[in-house]
Regions:
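Residues on the lipid-exposed face of transmembrane beta-strands in outer-membrane beta-barrel proteins
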Residues: 10-14, 68-72, 120-126, 172-176, ...
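Structural signature of outer-membrane beta-barrel domains
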Residues: 19, 29-33, 75-77, 87-91, ...
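Repeated loop/turn-to-beta-strand initiation elements of outer-membrane beta-barrel proteins
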Residues: 19-22, 76-80, 131-136, 180-185, ...
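Outer-membrane beta-barrel translocator domains and adjoining extracellular loop/strand segments
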Residues: 35-41, 48-49, 92-100, 145-158, ...
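Gram-negative outer-membrane beta-barrel transporters
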Residues: 84-89, 104-199
Length: 290
C-alpha cells in the first residue's frame, strides 16, 4: 500500500470590510483503509452485533473538497457564517454485506465507484447579553447534505446516498462562563438524520454470488444531550464533570423492504435489525497544577 500522492490545497479570502468577508477553499485528501479493513480475517463488531471480514482488494479513497463561505463578525466572539460545499469521493470505502461460509451474511468493506456530496451549512455564535444574559452564549451548526453514489456501468444497484452520510446534521449548545466564579458550564444538543449503516445487496448485483436481495440497514435519527461543568479552586485545583448522552435514547438499526402481497398490492415493511441502549457516560476529573 505504498503510494505517491500530491494533495493540493488553496485558500483565498476576500475581505469586504472589518466585519464581512468571503472565503473560497479547495483541498484534496485521502482516506486509507485500516489494517483490519484490508485483512482477510474475521472479527466481531459489538456495535453491529455481527461478524466483519476485511477485503484485501480495497483501494484508497481520494476526496476533493470545495467550499464557498460568507462570514459576518457582528462583534467580538460572535459569528454568522453561511457556506455551500461540494465533495467528490473517488472509490469511497463503505460497509456492505457479503456471503461467507455458505449463505451466512456478514459485514465487509467495498469500494464504490465514486460519490458526490453537496449542501449548505450555517454556523452561528452569539452572545446573549442583549437579553440580559451577559455570561451566556449560544452556538448553532446545521447542515443539509445531498449525497449520491455512482456505480459501475451495468450495475443493478439503485440510487442511494453514500453509506454513513446523513441528510442533515444539527449541533447546538448553550454556554455559561463566569470569570469571577472561575466556572464554565456547557449544555450541548446533537441530532443526525437517518443514514445507511450497512449497504444491502440488490438482486443480481455485480460481483454477488447470490441473487438474494438484502435491504440496506439504516441508523435512525437520535437525539443526544451532553453536559459539562468546570470549576477552578484557587490557582492550582480544577474539577471537571462531564455527562455524555443525558437522554440515553435507544439506538435503532432498521431495514425497509417493499413487499408484494398475493392480491398484487405493495407495501413498505420495516424491521428492527438491531436495538440497544448505550447508556450514559459520567466522568469526574480533578486537575492539580503545581
Amino acid at each position: 500500500y505504498k503510494t505517491d500522492d500530491v494533495f493540493p490545497s488553496l485558500n483565498t479570502t476576500y475581505k469586504i470590510n472589518d466585519q464581512h468577508q468571503v472565503r473560497l477553499s479547495y483541498g484534496r485528501s485521502i482516506n486509507r483503509p485500516e489494517f483490519r479493513e484490508v485483512s482477510s480475517s474475521v472479527y466481531y463488531d459489538f456495535d453491529l452485533a455481527s461478524n466483519v471480514q476485511g477485503n484485501t482488494e480495497l483501494k484508497n479513497c481520494y476526496v476533493d473538497n470545495l467550499d464557498l463561505r460568507y462570514e459576518w463578525y457582528p462583534s467580538r466572539g460572535e459569528l454568522i457564517s453561511l457556506a455551500v460545499f461540494y465533495k467528490h469521493f473517488d472509490s469511497p470505502i463503505e460497509w456492505t454485506y457479503t456471503v461467507a461460509g455458505g449463505t451466512d451474511l456478514i459485514y465487509s468493506y467495498k469500494n464504490a465507484k465514486s460519490a458526490n456530496n453537496y449542501g449548505v451549512e450555517l454556523d452561528i455564535r452569539k452572545n446573549l447579553g442583549f437579553i440580559g444574559l451577559k455570561d451566556f452564549s449560544w452556538s448553532f451548526n446545521g447542515a443539509l447534505i445531498k449525497s449520491k453514489v455512482q456505480f459501475e456501468k451495468g450495475a443493478k444497484e439503485e440510487d442511494r446516498p453514500m453509506q454513513g452520510q446523513s441528510p442533515y446534521l444539527i449541533n447546538t449548545g448553550i454556554f455559561y462562563k463566569n470569570e469571577p466564579l472561575k466556572m464554565d458550564i456547557a449544555l450541548l444538543y446533537n441530532r443526525i438524520g437517518k443514514r445507511i449503516i450497512g449497504v444491502g445487496r440488490s438482486e443480481g448485483s455485480t460481483g454477488d454470488d447470490s441473487n438474494s436481495r438484502v435491504p440496506h440497514s439504516y441508523e435512525m435519527p437520535r437525539n443526544t444531550i451532553d453536559f459539562s461543568l468546570a470549576k477552578k479552586f484557587g490557582e492550582h485545583l480544577e474539577l471537571k464533570l462531564n455527562v455524555r448522552d443525558l437522554l440515553a435514547e435507544k439506538i435503532y438499526y432498521k431495514q425497509f423492504a417493499d413487499v408484494t402481497y398475493s392480491d398484487g398490492s405493495k407495501k413498505e415493511v420495516e424491521e428492527i435489525a438491531r436495538c440497544y441502549k448505550p447508556g450514559r457516560n459520567i466522568g469526574l476529573q480533578a486537575i492539580y497544577k503545581f
